[in-house]
């Protein structure tokens, strides 16, 4: 009885000799009902990687079969179809994006009690009641939808003592502001 180790199909293809007696592991014959399928690996004789003296030495002690599993999870066609969310069609997302992009440049007024702390040399700025300009809709990046928690980028101008008019940008949710001119 010879010791065997398991190889990935790519490695086995690179080192396999035409006369080697490889067999598929048991995971290749079992069908899974889960969306993730397992790609089987090849079990190759240990003699491909070790010298005969090491095999004889190891087999004289105790004959144990060593198999290393190297199954790789891959997505099946069912899982790819299951990933597509049937409730949100691409056309509705495109409509939402087009609607938001059409509003860029509009004047907005902040309705929620918000404070920002990222204006230079000012401890905090209260945004409630301030008017600004909608600069960008950032929930879509390079044509793909991203999970932006605050998708609207709004530019504000505020008069600060000793500094004059200061421009800063803040990201807000849709329910935190209202459109002044539509």
Swiss-Prot record:
GO molecular function, one term: oxidoreductase activity
Main location: plastid
Compartment list: Plastid, Chloroplast
Single biological process term from Gene Ontology: photosynthesis
Disruption phenotype: Subtle developmental changes including slow development of young seedlings, an increased sensitivity to fluctuating culture conditions, and slightly delayed flowering time. High light induces rapidly chlorosis in leaves.
CC annotations in GO: chloroplast
Pfam families noted in UniProt: FeThRed_A (PF02941)
Transit peptide start-stop: 1-81
Family matches, as InterPro entries: Elect_transpt_acc-like_dom_sf, Fd_thioredoxin_Rdtase_alpha, FTRV
Keyword Nucleus part of the UniProt annotation: no
Top-rank taxon, per record: Eukaryota
UniProt keyword terms in alphabetical order: Chloroplast, Oxidoreductase, Plastid, Transit peptide
SUPFAM superfamilies referenced in this protein's UniProt entry, alphabetically: Electron transport accessory proteins (SSF50090)
Subunit note: Heterodimer of subunit A (variable subunit) and subunit B (catalytic subunit). Heterodimeric FTR forms a complex with ferredoxin and thioredoxin.
Family: Belongs to the ferredoxin thioredoxin reductase alpha subunit family.
Function of the protein: Variable subunit of the ferredoxin-thioredoxin reductase (FTR), which catalyzes the two-electron reduction of thioredoxins by the electrons provided by reduced ferredoxin.
Stated name of the protein: Ferredoxin-thioredoxin reductase subunit A1, chloroplastic
Organism (species): Arabidopsis thaliana (Mouse-ear cress)
Native organism taxonomy: Eukaryota, Viridiplantae, Streptophyta, Embryophyta, Tracheophyta
Gene this protein is translated from: FTRA1
């Amino acid at each position: 009885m010879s010791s065997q180790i398991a190889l990935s199909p790519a490695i086995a293809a690179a080192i396999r000799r035409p006369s080697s007696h490889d067999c598929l592991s048991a995971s290749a014959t079992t069908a899974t009902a889960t969306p993730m399928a397992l790609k089987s690996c090849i079990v190759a004789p240990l003699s491909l990687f070790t010298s005969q003296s090491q095999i004889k030495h190891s087999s004289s002690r105790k004959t144990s079969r060593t198999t290393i599993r190297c199954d790789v999870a891959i997505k099946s066609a069912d899982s790819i179809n299951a990933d597509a969310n049937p409730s949100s069609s691409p056309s509705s997302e495109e409509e939402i994006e087009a609607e938001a992009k059409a509003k860029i440049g509009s004047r907005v007024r902040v309705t929620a009690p918000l404070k920002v702390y990222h204006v230079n040399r000012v401890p905090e700025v209260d945004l409630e009641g301030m008017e600004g300009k909608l600069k960008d809709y950032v929930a879509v990046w390079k044509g793909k939808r991203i999970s932006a928690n605050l998708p609207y980028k709004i530019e504000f101008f505020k008069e600060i003592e000793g500094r004059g008019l200061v421009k800063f940008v803040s990201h807000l949710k849709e329910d935190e502001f209202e459109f002044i001119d539509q």
